[in-house]
Amino acid sequence: AAIAEDYPYDAVDTCAADGMCATACPVRINTGDLMKRLRAERHGERAQAAGEAVAEHWGGVSGTARVALRAAATLPRLAAAASAVARRVLPEDLVPLYSREVPAGGDTRPAAVYPANPAVVFFPTCLHQVFAPAETQQTGEHADRGARPSDTAGRGSGYAFLALCEAAGIAVAVPEGIGGMCCGTPWESKGFTDGARSMARRVVDGLWNSTRQGRLPVVVDASSCTHGLAGLGHLLPDDERVPRLRIEDAVAFTAREILPALTVPAKAASLTLHPTCSTTHLGIGEELRTVAEAVADEVVVPTGWGCCGYAGDRGMLHPELTDGATREEAADVAAYPTETYASCNRTCEMGMSRATGQVYRHVLELLAERCAPQDAGAHRTR
């Protein structure tokens, strides 16, 4: 009886559902998939319909979240008190806990663009629209100022990636309707399968057109979103277009296609690197380290590295999850300070910043701030 009573919290509510258990299991059993299924079974028809409605109006919803976080950042004590009261009245699994380390709302996503001969289609994620990058979080400045893509300071990893492509002479397209697109992970992880499927259809329609029926690769600037987009097939098993879409993380693309065209005149002395669960699933740990080594002379991955437990917004719903998940890694970080700290996913950066007291930033932001093209003219035809 005690196990049954505690199971909803101990298992369903506080599972990060990141699938890292499968990497340790000799037969690849992923209990995160089970937890997502159990979450879905909790939702009735009305809840599923609400989740689908959010997906269908995602552009407005994500924009509202961005504005709300900006407002909260101006009155953090009031926002924290309001969220604490709401969590006493409503289930904690519905109301995130607001605290000072939660970033303000971020920048708008890069606008749709389609040059004459694009080499790649860029999928800028909504993570960096909803949550400001760490630099903006520190300065309190916001970047809706019509800046060129190369003006990356405070604009997040999406604009950093565009700047790196510009420096390397790589033409980039951004899909029409990107403001209403998402990888679908927020719905899947919470068990809103109807919303996840609705979003998957919209994304596949948009990417199919912008990639010229799968001929161009799709590059994504947040590792969890890359992983989510790469796994859309199970939501649309009968859609023959899905396997033809080539999804790649921006870190891997940068390591292979951009770094050879750049020099980094001023490296950091040392960098602590937090790989993510998604980089493990995607198999791009070496590429992440390669980019980090372009930023700093010494790259340190803590021996106690593991899932940060932030898991999208789950670290805000259940802060104790992140506290427990990061304890060993945070101790390693404290024992060996470095000049800078990096990862490749905004919410993981938030989780590690909270756990360690250090400012974690996307490794592409750090690279874009330090790099210069080797010979920009020599690469303009790519």
Residue ranges and their predicted role:
Residues 1-15, 26, 32-47:
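Ferredoxin-type iron-sulfur electron-transfer modules and their immediate structural context
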